[in-house]
């Protein structure tokens, strides 16, 4: 199994972060949560959010916050399916990397 550690990894992380908030979450918080595990700039992340929305993996809605409109993102049903695919691929990819780095075969949980 080959897991694209560029675009696919960032997409998987973004979808996972958004999935943690069932009512949705906003761009700045997504950026902060993603930055806990990888370096990413807002100028990189916002186009990813727009692309995931265009691909029907994310839904958006606007809500007023402190006198301004804030755009919220939440997973669509297609987004849940895609996230599940990414998670399955990641498990296989991680097992292969573990075998190489640790020198032993790992059990898939």
Question: Where in this protein do the model-derived segments appear?
Answer:
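Short, hydrophobic-biased segments on the C-terminal half of alpha helices
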Residues: 49-51
């Amino acid at each position: 199994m080959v897991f694209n550690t560029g675009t696919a990894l960032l997409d998987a992380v973004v979808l996972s972060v958004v999935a943690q908030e069932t009512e949705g979450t906003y761009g700045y918080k997504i950026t902060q949560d993603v930055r806990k595990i990888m370096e990413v700039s807002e100028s990189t992340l916002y186009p990813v959010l727009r692309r995931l929305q265009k691909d029907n993996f994310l839904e958006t809605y606007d809500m007023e916050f402190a006198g301004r409109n804030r755009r919220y993102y939440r997973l669509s049903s297609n987004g849940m399916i895609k996230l599940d695919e990414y998670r399955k691929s990641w498990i296989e990819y991680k097992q292969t990397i573990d075998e190489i780095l640790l020198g032993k075969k790992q059990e898939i949980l």
